[in-house]
Structures are given as structure tokens and as C-alpha cells.
Amino acid sequence: MFSPIGKVAQPYFCSFLLSTILGFVIAPRTIAALKNIQKGRNPVRSCFPAAHLAKKSGIPSMGGVIILLPCILSTAIFGDLHDRDIWVILTTMVAFAILGGVDDYLKFTRQNPQGISLEAKLFAQLLIASAALIFLSYTSDSFTSTHIFSKGLIDLGWAYMPFAYIVVVGSSNSVNLTDGLDGLATLPIITSTAILGIIGHLSLQFGAEPPGVVGANIPIFCSALVGSALSFLWFNAHPAQVFMGDLGSLSLGASLGLMSVMLKCEFIYAISGCIFVAEAISSMAQVAYCKLTKGRKIFLVAPIHHHFEKAGLKEATIVTRAWVIAMVSFVVSLAAIIYIYR
């Protein structure tokens, strides 16, 4: 059914290997530097469970640099920097990383878990997403189309642009919400990235949609991201030595959402990232229900992983079960890919 990968896989493997090695090399010194800079000043919201407050305060954030730097360097070495697609992804990722980094910095300098206001953060996210999406709308022949579990593209017309905003900005914030327990967000990031990389490779191999995506840059980027995320997971797994922070979660979520838009696989991405979707829905449902009922709640705490934590489940149990769900969703996503590309 699928043609042999052949020599095209060589840059994928090299990108993955270099990024993994670089991640392991820079992680210890990066963690030490972040500890020295932040000096244990990593505020945690008081509404979270008491055990969470006790264990997480003092662990340095902004560890997303351990993922981003090796990924960017490896992509620059093995990718084609003359291709506009990779620049859209890298520029968007860096812009969201700067936004998240400023948010993280304000949190530990002000000793306030709020950081940038929600309104200002959302405005900045929409601004960055606008630049990327408007650029893509002028450079892609099929920008307003997508796969809705069909073998062909379906043109959504004017409705696609707001849909794309929801995908990119929603993905960014969903990953950010998920990054609340040791390793919880990292493995779903890895599995979702792998799915997008596979779709990117198949688009290259078969000359399939979307016609605006050319070359192996997206799978090379995804290979690098999987490698650096795996090395980060080594230090982020329970008991975590570092958190990716908003710097990592906002930028990685935006990158995944943007790639799904470029590859026209937003719905497959939603399946592979179902953990992110569940976390976002739980938070939105909690806020909406609380406003409608004047204070009543659906969950003990939102997002939902903190609900389970406050209900008495151990952190390791919550994370392991989330990882199981992520792996199952990975397999289901593969099945969807096979259906579309067979």
C-alpha cells in the first residue's frame, strides 16, 4: 500500500538523532541555569490541590528551550531553509515562544501566577496567528480546504479562516492547559507530532494534497521535535526537574496547530491530540457552567487533570492513564491516515 520510504527517511533519522542528542546535552546546564535565575520563585495557583502546591513550587519553568533550541538547529541543518513553509512554522513557533517566555518571566519576577493578562495574551496570539494564516492564504492553492475524514479536500470557503484561528490559537492554549503535571503534555506532544510528520511524508511521497506543501521540511521538523521532546521528557517525567512553561507549551501547541492547517489534517490532529481537546473542553465547560449557575462547578478544579488530582488519584496514575489514551489516539489516527491515503 505504501511505497518504501527509501533515502528520503535519512534526513528524518538524522534530524531526530541530532535533536535528541542536543536535548540531552543542553538539558542539565539549562535546568541549572533556570534554577539559578528563578531561585525557586515559580508561583503556583492557590486553587490547585495542596499536594500540587507543595510539590511543584520551586521547580523551574521555561524548560521549553530544551525542546525548541535543538529542534530549530536540527531543522536548520537538515531542512531546506529556502522553503517558505519551514520559515512560517519556525517564525510562528519563535513568536509564541517569546510571548510565553515573557509570561513566564513576569510570573516569577512578580511572584504572581497570572503573568500577562488573559486579554493581552489572547490578543498577541491572534496577532501572531493572523500573520501566519494570512501569509498561507496567499501562498497556498488550497488554503480554504480541509480533509473531514474524506479522501478528497472539502472547500469551506470563508468559514475556513475563523476555523484555522481556532485550530492554531486553540491548540496553543490547550497544550498550555495540559502542561500541569509531570510529563502530562510531553508524550501527547510527541505522538501528535509523529502523526503530523507521517502525514507530511505521505503528502511528499504520493504528491498528494495539500499542493502548497513541498519537500520534506515538515517531516524533518517533526522528527527534530520528537527527538528534542523525548530528551525533555527524560527530565520532565515524575518527579519533574523542570517544566516547559508557557514558553514551551504555547509555542509547541501553536506549531502543531499550524502544521495541521498546512497539511489539511486538522481533524486527525484533534484525534491524536484528544488529551489537549479534553483539557480545553473541561476548562471552558467549568467557566461557562460556573457563570450560568452563579458559582456552581462541574469539576472540583479545572482543567480536568487537577480534578482527578483533587479527587485523590496519584499524579503518576493520572499521567500514565493519559499516556495510554494518547497512545490509543495515536493508533486511531494512524487508522484514519490509512483510510485517507490508501
From Swiss-Prot:
It catalyses: UDP-N-acetyl-alpha-D-muramoyl-L-alanyl-gamma-D-glutamyl-meso-2,6-diaminopimeloyl-D-alanyl-D-alanine + di-trans,octa-cis-undecaprenyl phosphate = di-trans,octa-cis-undecaprenyl diphospho-N-acetyl-alpha-D-muramoyl-L-alanyl-D-glutamyl-meso-2,6-diaminopimeloyl-D-alanyl-D-alanine + UMP. Its main location: membrane. GO terms for molecular function: metal ion binding; phospho-N-acetylmuramoyl-pentapeptide-transferase activity; UDP-N-acetylmuramoyl-L-alanyl-D-glutamyl-meso-2,6-diaminopimelyl-D-alanyl-D-alanine:undecaprenyl-phosphate transferase activity. The gene is mraY. PANTHER family: PHOSPHO-N-ACETYLMURAMOYL-PENTAPEPTIDE-TRANSFERASE (PTHR22926), PHOSPHO-N-ACETYLMURAMOYL-PENTAPEPTIDE-TRANSFERASE HOMOLOG (PTHR22926:SF5). It comes from the Bacteria. InterPro entries: Glycosyl_transferase_4, PNAcMuramoyl-5peptid_Trfase, PNAcMuramoyl-5peptid_Trfase_CS. Belongs to the glycosyltransferase 4 family. MraY subfamily. One of its GO terms (cellular component) is plasma membrane. Its cofactor is Mg(2+). This is Phospho-N-acetylmuramoyl-pentapeptide-transferase. Its EC number is 2.7.8.13. It is found in: Cell inner membrane. GO terms for biological process: cell division; cell wall organization; peptidoglycan biosynthetic process; regulation of cell shape. Keywords: Cell cycle, Cell division, Cell inner membrane, Cell membrane, Cell shape, Cell wall biogenesis/degradation, Magnesium, Membrane, Metal-binding, Peptidoglycan synthesis, Transferase, Transmembrane, Transmembrane helix. Pfam families: Glycos_transf_4, MraY_sig1. It comes from Anaplasma marginale (strain Florida). Pathway: Cell wall biogenesis; peptidoglycan biosynthesis. It is a multi-pass membrane protein. Catalyzes the initial step of the lipid cycle reactions in the biosynthesis of the cell wall peptidoglycan: transfers peptidoglycan precursor phospho-MurNAc-pentapeptide from UDP-MurNAc-pentapeptide onto the lipid carrier undecaprenyl phosphate, yielding undecaprenyl-pyrophosphoryl-MurNAc-pentapeptide, known as lipid I. The chain crosses the membrane at residues 8-28, 58-78, 86-106, 116-136, 152-172, 184-204, 213-233, 242-262, 267-287, 318-338. It is an enzyme of class 2 (transferase).
